[in-house]
């Protein structure tokens, strides 16, 4: 046998041996995961698992997550559960999972460990946003509280239970500074205070915001996220997350410069650095000096952008004064969010808006509660008042209608099925259909508002009863005259006929109305409600 044959023989033998090893590894891990052997006590990796719960209507998946974590943690007692849902439904969570949740905020020392650290005052770990592919809407903002709790105890609100003690002032400048150095600076500041104007230290709060770098003339230049990521990789801070960041930065760089960086692309490909699941720390650091100048050039061209502050949960209209609005104007707040929960407050709300505008604020917003104890027409009145104020004062107000859910009611806490005493399924569905077309918000523009919600209260009530397909594809059905035909038939019903037809329409269930009435005129009206969105889309496609 010649030398070449001998070498070929040993090469094939090595390949076979390697393939056998790989095959055995694949068999092992297939069995390991198929049989869920990672749940066995000897294979559990985690000494402590923390779970933050959110909305109560995520009940099922949250409970599943807690029970899953119990199987991963070395000791079940070291599974920690807290957050909104766990606080509101503490007893139910314990009953189902056997884990007793932490209630409220971790605002005292020694709750989790025997030390003097107060968890609630620690900076957030923004690196977790680098772990996911989903781009969090508020990813470019610091998140913080400058107060906790609320002095009001509104019956529809969970804040008194979540944050029972009102705290007038929490500093944030050091948090912002540390987070900026660790994770890279962020453009905006999102404050989650529930009632900041109730604070007796409001002026101090505004000054602290300025100290944190948010003044009216402050600008933001995007940090070199490649350098931020490499710095954290070097010290071993959340390496998995920042390897993903580095790979994303490579992709941005190559996308921007294209064929000009063919050599860099070839190098990254050779080092398996173009995919986060193949990229390794050593390869990133090895190629760092080669790619560093290109990132410096790319980031040197970033333009300054204006920074903004947002008290995201809104401020109390009843506490707005000339003085605090002028003080608020010292920081780049946009928008000023003023709660408008009830029509009964419309005079106070309108005065608050005018006061804010007189102080210089022209970008406003609010949350508009509905499906609570309000009449449907009261939602219309509040939205229209905002549009009227926009027209009169030449300002911008964006309204966000928020549907009420009784989060502690045993029949409704885990779903979104609750219908207020003055509402019904059809009315709720109409509002949702309109808001879907406006992306959940109602802005300025009188003609648009009139088309979306009606020019007066009568038109709004007509809209509430309108077939859903005719709401979603308003122009199409109006154009072919079908909307007018439906409305004429509806109006021609007698009071006695409406007494039969309206409850059927309000149920928003048109599957078997033939069994509920044999009145031909009512049946004719109800037939319009069986027009589906798919029918309209097909018809519009044919017309094109």
Task: Locate the predicted segments by residue.
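Conserved SAM/AdoMet-binding glycine-rich loop
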Residues: 178-365, 370-372
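Aromatic/hydrophobic pocket-lining residues that form the small-molecule binding cavity
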Residues: 62, 172, 202, 321, ...
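Canonical Radical SAM [4Fe-4S] cluster-binding loop centered on the CxxxCxxC motif
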Residues: 136-178, 183-185, 197
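A structural motif corresponding to the C-terminal lobe/cap of the Radical SAM core domain
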Residues: 314, 327-492
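Glycine-rich beta-alpha loop elements in corrinoid/cobalamin-binding modules
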Residues: 2-140
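Radical SAM enzyme core and accessory elements
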Residues: 7-8, 15-20, 24-35, 42, ...
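Surface-exposed amphipathic alpha-helices with a cationic face
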Residues: 66-75, 158, 210, 357, ...
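Short, aromatic/basic amphipathic alpha-helical patches
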Residues: 64-69, 90-98, 204-210, 385, ...
């Amino acid at each position: 046998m010649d030398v070449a044959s001998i070498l070929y023989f040993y090469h094939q033998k090595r390949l076979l041996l390697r393939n056998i090893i790989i095959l055995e590894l694949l068999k092992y891990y297939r069995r390991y995961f198929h049989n869920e052997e990672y749940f066995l006590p000897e294979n559990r990796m985690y000494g402590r698992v923390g779970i933050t719960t959110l909305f109560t209507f995520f009940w099922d998946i949250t409970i599943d997550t807690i029970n899953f974590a119990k199987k991963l943690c070395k000791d079940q007692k070291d599974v920690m559960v807290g957050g909104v849902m766990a606080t509101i439904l503490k007893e139910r969570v314990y009953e189902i999972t056997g884990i007793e949740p932490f209630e409220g905020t971790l605002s005292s020392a020694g709750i989790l460990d025997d030390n003097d650290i107060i968890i609630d005052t620690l900076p957030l770990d923004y690196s977790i946003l680098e772990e996911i592919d989903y781009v969090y809407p508020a990813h470019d903002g610091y998140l913080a509280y400058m107060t906790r709790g609320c002095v009001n105890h509104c019956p529809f609100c969970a804040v008194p239970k979540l944050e029972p003690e009102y705290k007038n002032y929490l500093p944030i400048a050091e948090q912002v500074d540390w987070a900026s150095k660790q994770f890279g600076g962020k453009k905006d500041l999102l404050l989650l205070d529930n009632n900041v104007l109730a604070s007796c230290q409001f002026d101090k709060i505004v000054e602290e915001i300025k100290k944190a770098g948010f003044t009216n003339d402050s600008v933001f230049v995007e940090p070199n996220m490649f350098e931020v990521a490499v710095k954290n990789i070097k010290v071993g801070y959340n390496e998995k997350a920042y390897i993903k960041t580095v790979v994303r930065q490579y992709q941005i760089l190559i996308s921007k410069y294209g064929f000009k960086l063919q050599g860099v692309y070839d190098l990254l490909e050779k080092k398996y650095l173009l995919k986060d699941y193949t990229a390794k720390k050593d390869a990133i650091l090895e190629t760092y000096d080669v790619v560093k100048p290109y990132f410096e050039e790319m980031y040197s061209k970033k333009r300054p952008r204006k920074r903004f502050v947002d008290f995201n949960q809104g401020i109390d209209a009843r506490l707005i004064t000339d003085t605090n609005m002028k003080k608020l104007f010292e920081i780049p707040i946009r928008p000023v969010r003023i709660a408008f929960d009830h029509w009964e407050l419309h005079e106070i709300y309108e005065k608050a808006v005018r006061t804010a505008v007189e102080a210089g604020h022209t970008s406003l917003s609010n949350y508009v509660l509905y499906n609570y104890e309000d009449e449907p027409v009261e939602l219309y009145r509040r939205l229209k008042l905002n549009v009227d104020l926009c027209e009169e004062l030449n300002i911008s107000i964006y309204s966000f209608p928020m549907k009420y859910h009784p989060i502690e009611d045993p029949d409704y806490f885990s779903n979104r099925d609750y219908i207020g005493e003055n509402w019904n399924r059809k009315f709720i569905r109409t509002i949702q259909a309109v808001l879907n077309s406006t992306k959940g918000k109602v802005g300025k523009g009188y003609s648009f508002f009139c088309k979306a919600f009606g020019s007066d209260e009568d038109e709004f009530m007509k809209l509430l009863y309108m077939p859903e397909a005719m709401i979603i594809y308003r122009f199409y059905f109006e154009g072919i005259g079908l909307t007018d035909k439906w409305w004429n038939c509806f109006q021609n019903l007698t009071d006695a006929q409406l007494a039969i037809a309206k409850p059927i329409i309000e149920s928003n269930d048109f599957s078997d109305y033939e069994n509920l009435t044999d009145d031909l005129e009512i049946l004719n009206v109800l037939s319009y409600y069986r027009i589906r969105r798919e029918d309209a889309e097909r018809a519009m496609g044919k017309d094109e």
